[in-house]
């Protein structure tokens, strides 16, 4: 599959920066709890007779110290051991997900729930199960575990007459080199700008990114 190619980024990432250095021991304990709550994410990629499939991992992965560039390519044998990884650098915790596990919303819910459990264990804080934080001791609902493609795709036949997808232009970097652009924006100003345009913050950022790519 495409995920095996070194020039293809097979992971995406969500990170959070706290005000104190991360306690990796507590984070490992919080990850154990969170991984049990998300059986559809705590998985590894396995090869079947005809196709690949996802299988629950028998053991939660170890917390890794981040020593290289974010989103380093994951060799396929690593994905077959565990399809996500948790990395720590000083007071930042990041979770990198194999692209087939979930979308950005599901990944954000996982990270927020992990942080809620971490804060609970580390500081005794009671973080309610709301606003993207799931109850850590609850079992996953049937809706979380189902393959929703069949429900929403239905019996609509696939069309071969699809328009060509947009392709980025430019010269690719060699040897997996990545250029990272980091910026900090005051949340209140960002929300005010989104409100001015009648859109959500997510829609505003996506539109800005697409405009930047197009230009």
Predicted regions located by residue number:
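Flexible, P/S/T/G-rich "lid" or insertion loops adjacent to the active sites of thioester-utilizing
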Residues: 146-199
